[in-house]
Structures are given as C-alpha cells and as structure tokens.
C-alpha cells in the first residue's frame, strides 16, 4: 500500500493520514464462503498512522460485526496475509514430500497423516497434484521479493514453492513410468478449476499438467462441468471425455462432485489403463477391482490383475 497505492492517492494533492485515512485489511475469505465468513473471521487492520488504523477497526466492527485485530501499520497487516498463505504453501509442500516418500516406500500416507494429527500439536495439510489459485502459489513470491530487497533469502519459503511447482511434473513422471512412456498416449484431464465447485482457474494445475504431458508426447484432452467446451478452447485446452474413446489414462485435477461417481468398468471397456487420482477422490479398491492401475498421491501404485502384466510391474 505505502509503496504503490499511496503515491496514486496523493497525486491529487491531498495527504494520506491527514486529509484522508489509508487502511489495509487483507482478504480472509474464499470463493463460495465469503458471506459465511465475513462476520466470523477476525478482520486484521493496519493503517498509515494510528488514526487510520483505528478508523479501519471502527468501520469493520460496526458494519460487519466481526472481531477486529489492529496490528498497527500497513506493512504489518500485509505481513499477516502473506504469512498465512506461506504457512499453507509450506505445509502443503511438507505433505507432498511425505507423500513422495510414502509412494516409494509402499505406504498409504492418508491414514498416517490423520494419525499424526491426533497428538494435538501436528496440523498437516494434505498433499495433492499441485497448488493453484489466486493466493497460495502467488503470495510467497511477494515476501521472497521483499526479502531480497532487504538483502535476505528465505530459503524454506523458496523451497516450499519449488516443491509444489514440481508436483505436476513428478506425478506425470509416475504415470509415464507406469505406462512405459507417454509418447502417443491419450491422457484425459478431469477438471480445469483450481478448486472443487468453483468456476475459477487462476494458476490452475491443469496448465502445468497439460504442458508436461504434451512435452512427453501425449495427446491431451480435458473436461470440467463448470466450463463450456468453447471456454476450454479459449483457455488453450482441447475438450473431450472418456466416452469419446481412445483414452489411455485419466488424471484427476479437480475433485468436483460430478467426478465422484465413476463407472471404472466402463472406463476399462473404453480402453483406459491407468488412473492418476490427484485429489484422493476415489477408492483405490474400486479402481483396481475394475482392472485399472491406480496411482494416488502418497500411495504406492497398485493394479488389477488384468493390467499388471500388460502395463508394468507395480508395488503392492
């Protein structure tokens, strides 16, 4: 605010902090939960001076009825937002690393994460095929840049961001190993949106997945119940569905409820050989019982007998 917004606001000759208040209050809601959280989640406020911060505190307390936390300065309020997003990003990166170990060691990370959280001191988020959205993959870069300007390097934050950025590549590499290469394969992505039930695709992992798959020589199609085919095309994707035929593997990117109830036997009949469940949406046994290979985040690859010898030897 102080560096970029203040000069614009003062360009007309008025002085911030004396002629008008300047307050920063970070957004602490998310799509589809805005109204549910507005009056419940504490509003953090900071101002260009104490009077501005107090005015912001009074405004939100009066009109939202929400608890308010006055942290003092504009920079302090900005820091609160960044620290929350960075916590989420680094926590997910840790979960992704634990999941990667589990995949190799023949473990199922999901019940183990649940068990870890029971001590009351561990609060692990859950792994996935990638991190998208307006905030989590973006905001760490703001603090990294700010630290660089101060002569600092925030190595853990950089590492967490790099781990999460690599996740699509690493998971597609697992799929490639399972299918003994992706050149000439048809891979179908389920979900463009970065979150279930939300028609938003900012920094969606689907883009990274498509890039990695194309670079591996695969044909890539996608579907999302929240987007028309023309909208997918406008965003650089090729629309399709499993029933069109010729699909070798399905990659779940978004856990839309429309994708929950799948006839895996029908998928097998259509020629699908492997499923990469990027959001732990499906029961692995259901996939395997249909004779498909199941690849899950944090779960060693498993296959039904119909494809174990035809595709690849997998961990059991």
Regions from the language model: what does each represent?
Residues 1-316:
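Structural/interface elements that position substrates and couple domains in central-metabolism enzymes
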């Amino acid at each position: 605010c102080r560096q970029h917004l203040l000069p614009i606001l003062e360009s007309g000759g008025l002085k911030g902090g004396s002629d008008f208040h300047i307050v920063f209050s970070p957004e602490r809601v998310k799509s589809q939960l805005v109204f549910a959280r507005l009056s419940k989640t504490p509003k953090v406020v900071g101002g260009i001076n104490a009077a501005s911060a107090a005015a912001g505190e009074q405004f939100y307390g009066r009109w939202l009825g929400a608890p308010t936390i006055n942290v003092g300065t504009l920079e302090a309020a900005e820091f609160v937002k960044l620290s929350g997003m960075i916590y989420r990003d680094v926590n997910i990166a840790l979960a992704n690393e634990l999941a990667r170990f589990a995949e190799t060691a023949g473990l199922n990370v999901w019940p183990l994460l649940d068990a870890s959280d029971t001590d009351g001191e561990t609060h692990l988020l859950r792994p996935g095929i990638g991190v998208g959205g307006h905030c989590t993959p973006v905001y760490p870069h703001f603090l990294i840049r700010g630290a660089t300007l101060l002569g600092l390097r925030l190595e853990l934050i950089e590492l967490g961001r790099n781990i999460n950025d690599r996740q699509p590549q690493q998971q597609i590499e697992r799929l490639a190993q399972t299918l003994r290469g992706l050149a000439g394969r048809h891979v179908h992505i389920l979900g463009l949106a970065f979150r279930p039930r939300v028609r938003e695709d900012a920094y969606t992992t689907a883009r990274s997945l498509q890039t990695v798959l194309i670079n591996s020589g695969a044909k890539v199609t996608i579907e999302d119940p929240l987007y028309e085919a023309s909208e997918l095309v406008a965003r650089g994707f090729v629309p399709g569905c499993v029933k069109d035929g010729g699909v070798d593997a399905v990659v779940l990117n978004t856990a839309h409820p429309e994708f929950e109830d799948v006839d895996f036997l029908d998928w097998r009949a259509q020629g699908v050989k492997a499923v990469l469940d990027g959001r732990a949406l499906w029961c692995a046994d259901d996939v395997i019982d249909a004779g498909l290979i199941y690849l899950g985040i944090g779960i060693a690859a498993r296959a039904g007998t119909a494809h174990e010898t035809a595709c690849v030897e997998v961990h059991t």
